[in-house]
Amino acid sequence: MIKAVLFDMDGVLVDTEWFYNRRRVAFMEEKGFHFDEIPDLSGSNEPAIWEALVPDDIELRERLRVEYKQVYSPDHPVPYAELLNNQTEPVMRELHKRGVKCAIASSSYRELIDELVDIAGIADVL
């Protein structure tokens, strides 16, 4: 019998990967960078993403990373309600009803996980 299910957040509960890729490119283009196509950095960690975007200038990479995280991202938040997998809540509620424990495993920041949980209305089944 299944006792617990772990759900990944990005790409499973909420389709954020495409949004993150596009948001990063929009930021970089505002800074004068050009992309022939949007790089798919899905599943990469933050240091690897920024090294891929700015491979040759460590100081510029760090300045852009900080500005993106502290200014650009808060000004361009993830629209979780629009990107939420519509099966998230019903599946978790059904599992909970059957006595299966549910949890979210994610490398996302805790405040983002909490925001998703609130928007999805699933705090009571985790």
Tell me what each language-model feature is.
Residues A103, Y109-L126:
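Substrate-recognition "cap/lid" segment bordering the active-site pocket of phosphatases
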Residues I2-P90, E94-R98, E111, A123:
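N-terminal helical cap/lid subdomain that shapes the substrate entry/recognition surface
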Residues L13, A103-I104:
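Short catalytic-loop micro-motif centered on adjacent basic/acidic residues
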